[in-house]
C-alpha cells in the first residue's frame, strides 16, 4: 500500500493504461500517467534523467513504447540502467509481456497446466485506424511455444517478426 508508480506512454492506450491504473488503486497505491509528448521527454530529457529522477519520487516505472521498431526496448533498458526502482515493460517494439502473461493465465485456467501440443492461432492484420505493432503476436509466439504450444500466426506477407527474439 501507499506505493507510487509512474506510467510513461509514448502512444495511446485504453486497456493497458486503465488496467495498470486500476491495479495500483486496488492495491492501495497511486499511478501517475505521463504522456511522453507533453513531458520533458518531448524536449529531449534522457532515459538516464528519467530513471534517476523518477526513482527518487516513487516505487516503479512502467513504460509503453511500442510503435517504433528498434526504440522501445532500448529506451526501457536505458531507463532501467539508471533507475533504482523496478522498470516494467507495459509494451515495447519487441514484446507485450503483461498482456502475453495474462493470455497465458487465461489459457491455463481453461486448459490446465500441461499445454503441450495445444494448438492456438493468432491473427495479425491490417487496421484502418493505426499500425498494429508486432509486439503482441511476437510476444505470443515467444511465450506460448516455451510452454509447448503449437502456434500458428496468420499475417499479411509484409508483416514480419524480428529474427533475434524468436531465436531465444
What are these language model-derived features?
Residues 10-22, 109-168:
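Glycine-rich phosphate/diphosphate-binding loop of Rossmann-like nucleotide-binding domains
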Residues 2-109:
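Phosphate/diphosphate ligand-binding glycine-rich loop within oxidoreductases
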Amino acid at each position: 500500500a501507499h506505493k507510487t508508480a509512474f506510467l510513461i506512454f509514448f502512444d495511446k492506450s485504453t486497456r493497458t493504461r486503465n488496467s495498470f491504473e486500476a491495479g495500483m488503486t486496488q492495491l492501495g497505491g497511486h499511478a501517475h500517467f505521463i504522456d511522453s509528448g507533453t513531458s520533458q521527454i518531448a524536449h529531449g530529457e534522457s532515459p538516464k534523467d528519467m530513471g534517476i529522477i523518477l526513482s527518487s519520487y516513487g516505487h516503479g516505472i512502467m513504460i509503453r513504447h511500442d510503435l517504433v521498431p528498434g526504440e522501445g526496448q532500448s529506451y526501457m533498458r536505458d531507463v532501467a540502467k539508471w533507475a533504482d526502482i523496478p522498470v516494467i515493460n507495459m509494451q515495447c517494439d519487441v514484446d507485450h509481456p503483461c498482456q502475453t502473461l495474462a493470455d497465458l493465465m487465461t489459457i491455463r485456467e481453461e486448459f490446465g497446466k500441461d499445454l503441450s501440443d495445444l494448438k492456438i492461432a493468432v491473427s495479425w492484420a491490417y487496421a484502418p485506424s493505426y499500425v498494429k505493432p508486432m509486439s503482441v503476436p511476437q510476444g505470443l509466439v515467444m511465450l506460448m511455444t516455451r510452454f509447448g504450444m503449437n502456434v500458428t500466426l496468420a499475417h499479411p506477407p509484409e508483416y514480419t517478426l524480428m529474427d533475434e527474439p524468436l531465436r531465444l
